[in-house]
């Protein structure tokens, strides 16, 4: 979920900050 830092970590590494879902990309 949004609070799962382990899930967000790959996206932080890509410079996206959070998972694409947090940007409403429809993923």
Swiss-Prot record:
Record localization: Secreted
UniProt record, GO biological process: neuropeptide signaling pathway
Keyword Secreted assigned: yes
Record bears the keyword Heme: no
Key words, A-Z: Amidation, Neuropeptide, Secreted
GO CC terms, sorted: extracellular region
Leucine amide PTM positions: 27
Superkingdom: Eukaryota
Family classification: Belongs to the allatostatin family.
Function as written in the Swiss-Prot or TrEMBL entry: May act as a neurotransmitter or neuromodulator.
Protein name per its UniProtKB record: Carcinustatin-20
């Amino acid at each position: 979920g949004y609070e799962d830092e382990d899930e967000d970590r790959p996206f932080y590494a890509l410079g996206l900050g959070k998972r694409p879902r947090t940007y409403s990309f429809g993923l």
